[in-house]
A protein has these predicted regions:
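Catalytic phosphate/metal-binding cores of nucleic-acid and nucleotide-processing enzymes, i.e., regions
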Residues: 1-105
Length: 105
């Protein structure tokens, strides 16, 4: 969160809500809302992390009455590296949508 703010982006930590958890951080970059699920673990379980991020983004949208669920990404902190070297996990469809959106602006 501090890193995103340092770069000038809106970023806010989301409250934990058990089964209704909405992700770890909401950020707005170039007018687009994103939900970030942040992990700092020795063992990486991408399918579990990904499912959690997608569920929590849907919870975020539902709690706010938003029709479109914002894109969710998993941020995995690399061991022995700073936050700026974290891995960002997204699926191919999201990546292609981001490329298409950026090409039209």
């Amino acid at each position: 969160m501090k890193y995103l703010r340092k770069l000038g982006h809106f970023a806010e930590r989301l409250a934990k809500a058990g089964s209704n958890d909405e992700g770890d951080i909401v950020t707005i970059i170039a007018g687009q809302t994103y939900i970030l699920e942040c992990k700092n673990r020795k063992s990486i379980n991408l399918p579990q992390f990904w499912a959690e991020a997608q569920t929590e983004a849907a919870n975020y949208a539902k709690a706010r009455g938003v029709v479109a669920t914002p894109p969710a990404f998993v941020i995995v902190k690399r061991r022995q590296h700073g936050v700026e070297k974290s891995w960002v996990i997204q699926d191919l469809d999201q990546w292609l949508q981001d490329r298409s959106s950026n090409a039209s602006t």
